[in-house]
Design a protein with these regions (language model features):
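A glycosyltransferase accessory/donor-loop signature
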Residues: 1-2, 8, 18, 169-311
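Short, acidic, metal-binding catalytic loop of nucleotide-sugar glycosyltransferases
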Residues: 22-31
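Short internal beta-strands
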Residues: 33-40, 132-134
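Short, aromatic/basic amphipathic alpha-helical patches
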Residues: 44-56, 254
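Active-site-proximal specificity loops/subdomain of glycosyltransferases
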Residues: 52-95
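GT-A fold catalytic core of metal-dependent nucleotide-sugar glycosyltransferases
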Residues: 66-69, 86-138, 152-154, 159-162
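A short, conserved beta-to-alpha structural element at the edge of catalytic cores
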Residues: 130-150, 254-257, 270
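Conserved nucleotide-sugar donor-binding
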Residues: 159-171
Length: 311
């Protein structure tokens, strides 16, 4: 039985369905226990998600309205930063999951699973508490801001294999909520919290397990030692992470794998979804963006931030 943990509110329920549908498609012979942490979700939406999961395992809703005192305080004190409120629920994972659960795979919901997850789920943690991929885009800036050393990992927390038993043992010494409360002046998002709290206890995963939108930029600014990987990551991403503002559920998304989101969406109870625009097509900003995109596509302009198209 494969245990998956994810977070979503009512607004992101559709995207949970798409991500899980892709997971089940790529892993047809597996059974899953899905733990969905949420703060707001209607009964009708829950029924739709149960329908998505029922042929592949069990779905458990772990609900919380931030009534945990530590969460409430941290939420109040970091409200001006870039924390998405639903992300606070990550901090409650050790308390919310069943006591008999020792390992799980955490997945963000703005993803498409594009490969069998056996290798990922059964990662040898080698004594580390969690395994995840580097977050390259602003990695050095994050390290400098948080006071991390070169050997300390700054990860993208969208895909994590976690030894829950070891995390709970660590919590007995110093609860993550209390740790973050005492370091709140440093924190801009939940990834900062994971980097600091699990400092020295993180194993890096191969980048194929969390191929972020960053890798599809015209000239991604990553470490030279990883440049040789870029073409392979673009052509054969095992997990595609749509982690930029213009997500694949917007008409004006230019991500080359948006079509996979549309493919799996058709297999969910949200198949009649009408794609809105992220930027209004009536705005000057929209047409400037379109012009820049097509100038890049035609080779007239070279903008490092422009997303490539796959041939």
């Amino acid at each position: 039985m494969y245990c998956i943990v994810c977070l979503a509110n009512e607004a992101y329920a559709q995207h949970v369905a798409v991500m899980l549908t892709s997971l089940f498609y790529q892993n047809p012979q597996k059974s899953f226990r899905i733990f969905l942490m949420t703060n707001t979700m209607t009964e009708n939406t829950k029924k739709k998600l149960i329908h998505v999961v029922e042929s592949h395992g069990e779905l458990f809703f772990l609900e919380d309205d931030y009534n945990n005192l530590g969460i409430a305080m941290l939420k109040s004190e970091t409200s001006t930063k870039s924390w998405n409120p639903i992300m606070y629920l990550k901090l409650l994972i050790p308390q919310k999951l069943p006591v008999d659960l020792e390992r799980f795979l955490f997945l963000d919901v703005d993803m498409i699973i594009n490969h069998d997850i056996d290798e990922l789920y059964n990662t040898n943690l080698d004594g580390y508490i969690l395994a995840a991929c580097d977050d390259y885009k602003y990695q050095q800036a994050h390290r400098d801001r948080l006071g991390l050393k070169e050997k300390d990992e700054y990860i993208n927390s969208g895909v994590m294999v976690i030894d829950l038993k070891a995390w709970r043992e660590k919590e007995k010494q110093y609860q993550m909520i209390n740790f973050l409360e005492n370091n709140k002046e440093l924190l801009n998002n939940d990834q900062d919290g994971f980097a600091l709290y699990f400092r020295g206890e993180i194993k890096l995963l191969p980048n194929k397990w969390n191929v972020t939108t960053f890798y599809f930029e015209q000239t991604p600014r990553i470490l030279d030692k990883y440049l040789s990987e870029v073409n392979e990551l673009r052509s054969h991403p095992y997990i595609i992470h749509f982690c930029e503002p213009i997500k694949p559920w917007f008409t004006d998304c230019k991500h080359p794998y948006q079509y996979l989101y549309k493919k799996y969406l058709k297999q969910t109870p949200w198949s009649d979804y009408k794609f809105p625009f992220f930027i209004s097509p009536l705005s000057v900003k929209f047409w400037k963006s379109e012009l820049k995109y097509w100038l890049n596509r035609c080779g007239i302009r070279k903008d490092s931030m422009n997303l490539i198209s796959l041939k």
